[in-house]
Every structure is written in structure tokens, then in C-alpha cells.
Curated annotation (Swiss-Prot):
Taxonomy of the source species: Bacteria, Pseudomonadati, Spirochaetota, Spirochaetia, Spirochaetales
Source organism superkingdom: Bacteria
Name of the protein described by the UniProt record: Uncharacterized protein BB_0048
Organism: Borreliella burgdorferi (strain ATCC 35210 / DSM 4680 / CIP 102532 / B31) (Borrelia burgdorferi)
């Protein structure tokens, strides 16, 4: 499941950079990305992040 979420993050960032949006990527998403690299989150946190990324 973590791999699927990281894939969605990569997809979201590629869409942002491909469309050349003029504002920096959301610090909120960056926070989650860095947190997943260093911590293990509960199932609820994973689902919340997945729901957040589904908005892209």
C-alpha cells in the first residue's frame, strides 16, 4: 500500500511540473512524503493520505 501511495505522490508531482504551475508544491504533501520515509503510520493515516491524493 505504501508503494501505491508513493506512486500517487510521484504522479501528482509530475502533473504539477508538467503543467508548469507557478507556485511551489504543497508543503503539506511534502510533509507526508518525508514522514513516510522516516516513520510508520497507522492504517487510518495511510487512508487519509490516499484520499488527499485522490483529489489531484
Amino acid at each position: 500500500m505504501l508503494n501505491k501511495i508513493l506512486d500517487k505522490l510521484v504522479e501528482a508531482y509530475s502533473i504539477i511540473f508538467r503543467t508548469r504551475v507557478q507556485f511551489p508544491p504543497s508543503p503539506f504533501i511534502l510533509f507526508f512524503f518525508l514522514s513516510f520515509k522516516h516513520n510508520s503510520y497507522s492504517q487510518q493515516a495511510l487512508l487519509s493520505l490516499e484520499n488527499l491524493l485522490s483529489l489531484f
